[in-house]
Amino acid sequence: MANRYPDIVFSVAVGNEATVDWTDHFVPVPHMIEYVRRVKQAVVQPVTFCENYVPWQDKLVDLVPELDFISLHTYPVWEYKHIHEAIDYTCENYDSVARRHPGKPVVITEAGWATSSNGRGMRAEHASQELQDLYYRDLLEWSRRAGVLTFVFEAFDEPWKGSPDPLEPEKHWGLFTVDRRPKLAMQTLYPELMSDAASSQIG
């Protein structure tokens, strides 16, 4: 697929969050190195691996030389950070990995903020559209100023994820609801979305 659409696929990630202790699809680092080498022989795009910031400090040091760039995940709200601490914590996560591996490009491939929570894994009061809006404003300002390529997580809510509880935080990371309604962060960035939504309801 990557070779068929080289103008669309700009890089290939060999796995996602597969070396952290809490994953249900754990892959040992030597196996990951083997997979990366095999993929690099098969595609022309840069090859990476996506992981939480912590394993890049030590566990993945043997993997780093095999990659074209490091893909980093950072979620302050999962680590019980208040909104006023959030962007500084994201910057610290990025800087710690960049300093650990000088000369290797680092891309943030997941950063986000939940909009609802039942208290599992984060304080319920820390998850809201208002706080997501504030975090994304800070994140976009910092990433532009610092020149750090950043991908946000995620476009749409995923109500099938996590537990059956409707307030399960895994379900509520989207910039849009599952039925494509823009949340506050998108309304702030693109006010025209609201007028477009109103027009579509009238029409």
Predicted regions, residues:
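Acidic (Asp/Glu)-rich catalytic clusters
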Residues: 1-8, 61-66, 99-101, 144
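Alpha-helix N-cap and loop-to-helix initiation/capping positions
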Residues: 26-34, 84-92, 123-134
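Surface-exposed amphipathic alpha-helices with a cationic face
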Residues: 28, 32-44, 94-102, 140, ...
